[in-house]
Every structure is written in C-alpha cells, then in structure tokens.
C-alpha cells in the first residue's frame, strides 16, 4: 500500500477489511479523506504535529503528538501511510478493551523493550498534561505528572520491581476507572 495516491486495490481493501474493524465502504471513505488531507499518500511527522496543535490550542501538544506519531509509524520510515493510520484508528475506536490496552502499553513503552519504566510513563503523562494545558482541572493527588505516575505505579507495579509489564498494565487498568476512561479519550485524540 505504502504511498499510493490512487484508489485502493481489491487486494488492499480485502487485507484492510480482514485486519481492521471497518467494512469496505468505511475503508474507502477513510482513504478518500486521507488522500484529501495527504495528497502524497503519507503524513509527515511535522504535519501530524500541526494537526494536533489545531485540536489543543490551549496546551502544547507537540511532545504527545511526537510520541503518538512513533506508535503510528510501524515501519519507522518517518511517515504515516494509510494502512498504518487506519489500523490504529480501528484499534482505538473499535478495538476490544484488550487491544486498546495493548495499544496504550505500546505508547508508554518508549524503548519498545516490553516494559514501562517510571521515566517512560512520566514522559508520556507529562506530555499529556502539557497538551491539555488549562483545559482540565486535576485532582489534588494528581496535580503533577509525577504524582499521577506514582499513583499509577503504586496500583500497577504489584511486585515493586520498578517497571510495569503488559500483564500488570492490563490488570491495573481494569481496576482503575480513570485509565479506562483515558483509553476512551484516545478515541477523540486520534
């Protein structure tokens, strides 16, 4: 699929239909919109960040958008192609809870080693706080990114080894309604 700018082939449509929660018509509509916004058939990092700035004018979304871009860009070529875009959109908007949790874990696992360290989570949480700016009033026990991450680690890092595995992340997320709520927020952030 890559940087094609024409209609999707039947094979491409079939493949995307099998690997996403969208039907053929929806895939074609998303593809048409993607090409309208990205005539080259790909979305560069700087353009992705610009789009995020439009959605969060009262905050600074650059850091979060850059982290998010990395999760989208599966082939690490510096661009988001339609297949990458529609796959993430499918997972975040229509995926199962388990799929959404795996996707969120991938966002936090910055070095892709299968674990989330305190610093990795702090990086993402701080970027979310910066992005939201003055739009959100925080609880006193989550007034800073550090406080939020300490609270999350206390909940999730059951064996207190300093990092969170995918299983710990899944289990901890299921008992904290705010995390499930945040996963549903991603529906609107992407």
UniProtKB/Swiss-Prot annotation:
Please tell me whether the keyword Aminoacyl-tRNA synthetase is annotated for this protein: no
Q: How does it sit in the membrane?
A: Peripheral membrane protein
Here the disulfide bonds are: none
Alphabetized InterPro entries for the sequence: EF-hand-dom_pair (IPR011992), EF_Hand_1_Ca_BS (IPR018247), EF_hand_dom (IPR002048), Recoverin (IPR028846)
Q: Where is the lipid attached (N-myristoyl glycine)?
A: 2
Q: Which GO terms describe its cellular component?
A: cellular bud membrane; cytosol; Golgi membrane; intracellular membrane-bounded organelle; membrane
Further remarks about this protein from its record? Binds 3 calcium ions via the second, third and fourth EF-hand. Present with 7160 molecules/cell in log phase SD medium.
| Similarity section | Belongs to the recoverin family.
Protein name, per record = Calcium-binding protein NCS-1
Record organism: Saccharomyces cerevisiae (strain ATCC 204508 / S288c) (Baker's yeast)
What lineage is this protein's organism placed in? Answer: Eukaryota, Fungi, Dikarya, Ascomycota, Saccharomycotina
């Amino acid at each position: 699929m890559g940087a094609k700018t024409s209609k999707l082939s039947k094979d491409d449509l079939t493949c995307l239909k099998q690997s996403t929660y969208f039907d053929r018509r929806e895939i074609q509509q998303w593809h048409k919109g993607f090409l309208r916004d990205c005539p080259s058939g790909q979305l560069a990092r700087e353009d992705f960040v610009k789009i995020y700035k439009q959605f969060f004018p009262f905050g600074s979304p650059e850091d979060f958008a850059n982290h998010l871009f990395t999760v989208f860009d599966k082939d690490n070529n510096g661009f988001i192609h339609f297949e990458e875009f529609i796959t993430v959109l499918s997972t975040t908007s229509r995926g199962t809870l388990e799929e959404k949790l795996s996707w969120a874990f991938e966002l936090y696992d910055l070095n892709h080693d299968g674990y989330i360290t305190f610093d990795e989570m702090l990086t993402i949480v701080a970027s979310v706080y910066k992005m939201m700016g003055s739009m959100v009033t925080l609880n006193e026990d989550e007034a800073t990114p550090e406080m939020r991450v300490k609270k999350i680690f206390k909940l999730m890092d059951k064996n207190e080894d300093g990092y969170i595995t995918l299983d710990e992340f899944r289990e901890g997320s299921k008992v904290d309604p705010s995390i499930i709520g945040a996963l549903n927020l991603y529906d609107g952030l992407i």
